[in-house]
Amino acid sequence: MKAMIFAAGLGTRLKPLTDHTPKALLPINGKPMLEHVILKLKDAGFNQIAINIHHLGEQIIDFLQANNNFGIEIFVSDERDYLLDTGGGIKHAESFLQGDEPFLIHNADILSNIDLRKLYEHHLETNPLATLLVSKRKTSRYLLFDKENKLCGWRNRETGEVKSFYPYFEPNQYKEFAFSGIHVLSPKIFDWMEEWTGKFSIINFYLSICAKTNIHAYDAENLRLLDIGKPESLALAEQWLKEEI
C-alpha cells in the first residue's frame, strides 16, 4: 500500500522554531511530527511512502537514513529547487505513486485519531476518484458537498468568495465540511492532471473537475484532529499524545 506525506512546508507560522529545523522535524512528545505520521501509516499497513521535501530538506533525508527508513520503502520527492504546492507535489511523485492501487495523502503536520486503514478500505468500496477526510470543525474556508457527499464547491466564510464549476451554484444549498489534509486518491487522478503543470493546489484541481467526476467526503464519527501549524498547537499536541499514552 502506497502513501505520500507532505513534508515540504516552510513552517512560516512556526517561526523562529523553523528557522533552522524543517517543520516536519519539530518534536512532539519526544518524536518529530514526521515520525508520528510515518508510524501511523506503517501501523495501518502502508509500506511504500513518498515524502516531499523543500525547506531544509537535507535534514529530513538525514533523519530518514538515521532511522533506516523505519523498515519500509521510502521515496524522497525532491522539491528543494521549487515548491510545487499540494497538487504539483502529488504530480511530481507520479513515478512512485502510479500503479493499480489507490494511495493515501497525509500532511506531516496533522495529528488525528482516524483509522487510516478504514478510510482506505472505504475508498476501495465506494471507488470515487478521490475520498477526502472531512469534519464539521469551525474554520473560515469550507468545501461544499451535496446530499450524496459529492464535492460541488468551496466557500470562504470571511470574504464571501465562492468557487464552483456548476452553473447557477447556490452555496447555501450544500453541506459545509472542513478538509483535514488526509485523502485517498485513485491512480486515475494522473490522467485528469495531464494538462496541469508546475505549482498548483490540489483543492483547486478538485474543484475544477468535481462536476465531471466523483470527489467524495468521508465524515468519520468522533474524529479528533489537530493541525499543528502554530506554536500554541504544539503544546496541544504534546498534551494529546500524553493522554493517548
Indicate where each model-derived feature is located:
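A short, conserved acidic/glycine-rich loop-to-beta-strand motif
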Residues: 126-136, 141
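Catalytic-core segments of class I nucleotidyltransferases/pyrophosphorylases
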Residues: 101-106, 111, 117-124, 137-138, ...
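Conserved beta-strand segments of alpha/beta enzyme cores
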Residues: 24, 73-75, 129, 150, ...
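Conserved N-terminal catalytic core of the sugar/cofactor nucleotidyltransferase
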Residues: 2-5, 31-107, 118, 196-197
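Phosphate- and divalent-cation-binding pockets in alpha/beta enzyme and binding domains
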Residues: 13, 59-62, 86, 92, ...
